[in-house]
């Protein structure tokens, strides 16, 4: 099992961040349950990666962002990964995800943080405000993976978190710098 990675779940108020986590982890979220505002909760999950290794995730369920309110900066300093959540029936929530991605890029080097995007409330697609093709095109241009999901179908939630855990548990790449006390490969003559 890995060291434990910190993943921040963020998005506008009422896009379903807590519902996603409760359905993913416990399989017991009730649709239509009265919304109660989250201050911040931390969930622990052991997620199997695509390599069969279990990765421990600390999932930070953040307070829903409101208009004009930014994600607190301390999240950028400790997060190993982000799950950006919008609602397919709320264009403003998608626009906020676009801004969050820019903020993450500004505060973290893209190469060291894993990001997945979830378009939630797919079951409300008749009220859709976010075009699926436009969202996927944006995700490709930002080099992030985007899924449209619904808490009514827990299976739609598993793949994004499996991919995230897999990205977070990838083995470190080997350094190209020679280590002290070792000879450089391919250079048997130190005089050259």
From Swiss-Prot:
Keyword vocabulary terms for this entry: Cytoplasm, GTP-binding, Nucleotide-binding
PROSITE patterns in the record: RAB
Region described as Interactions with NFKBIA and NFKBIB: 58-93
Motif Effector region: chain residues: 35-43
Gene Ontology CC: cytosol; endoplasmic reticulum
TM annotation in the entry: none
Region: Disordered, residue numbers: 168-192
GO biological-process terms attached to the record: lung alveolus development; negative regulation of canonical NF-kappaB signal transduction; Ral protein signal transduction; regulation of tumor necrosis factor-mediated signaling pathway; surfactant homeostasis
SMART domains: RAB, RAS
One GO molecular-function entry: GTP binding
Positions annotated to bind GTP: 11-18, 61-65, 120-123
Cellular localisation: Cytoplasm
Entries under InterPro entries matching the protein: KBRS, P-loop_NTPase, Small_GTP-bd, Small_GTPase
Pfam families per record: Ras
Job of this protein: Atypical Ras-like protein that acts as a potent regulator of NF-kappa-B activity by preventing the degradation of NF-kappa-B inhibitor beta (NFKBIB) by most signals, explaining why NFKBIB is more resistant to degradation. May act by blocking phosphorylation of NFKBIB and mediating cytoplasmic retention of p65/RELA NF-kappa-B subunit. It is unclear whether it acts as a GTPase. Both GTP- and GDP-bound forms block phosphorylation of NFKBIB.
Oligomer status and interactors: Interacts with both NF-kappa-B inhibitor alpha (NFKBIA) and beta (NFKBIB) in vitro. However, it probably only interacts with NFKBIB in vivo. Forms a complex with NFKBIB and NF-kappa-B heterodimer (p50/NFKB1 and p65/RELA). Also interacts with c-Rel (REL).
Domain notes: In contrast to other members of the Ras family, the members of the KappaB-Ras subfamily do not contain the conserved Gly and Gln residues in positions 13 and 65, which are replaced by Leu residues, and are therefore similar to the constitutively active forms of oncogenic forms of Ras. This suggests that members of this family are clearly different from other small GTPases proteins.
Family: Belongs to the small GTPase superfamily. Ras family. KappaB-Ras subfamily.
Protein name, UniProt field: NF-kappa-B inhibitor-interacting Ras-like protein 1
Organism for this UniProt entry: Mus musculus
Gene for this chain: Nkiras1
């Amino acid at each position: 099992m890995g060291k434990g990675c910190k993943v921040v779940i963020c998005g506008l108020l009422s896009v379903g961040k807590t519902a996603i986590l409760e359905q993913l982890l416990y399989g017991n979220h009730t649709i239509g349950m009265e919304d109660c505002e989250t201050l911040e909760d931390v969930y622990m999950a052991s997620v199997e990666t695509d390599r069969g290794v279990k990765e421990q995730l600390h999932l930070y369920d953040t307070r829903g962002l409101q208009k004009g309110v930014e994600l607190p900066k301390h999240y950028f300093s400790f997060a190993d990964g982000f799950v950006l959540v919008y609602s397919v029936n709320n264009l403003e929530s998608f626009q906020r995800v676009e801004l969050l991605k820019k903020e993450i890029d500004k505060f973290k080097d893209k190469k060291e943080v894993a990001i997945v995007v979830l378009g939630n409330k797919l079951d409300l697609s008749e009220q859709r405000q976010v075009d699926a093709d436009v969202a996927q095109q944006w995700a490709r241009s930002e080099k992030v993976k985007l899924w449209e999901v619904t808490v009514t179908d827990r299976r739609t939630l598993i793949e994004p978190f499996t991919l995230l855990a897999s990205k977070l548990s990838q083995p470190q790449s080997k350094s190209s710098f020679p280590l002290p006390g070792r000879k450089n490969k391919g250079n048997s003559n130190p005089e050259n």
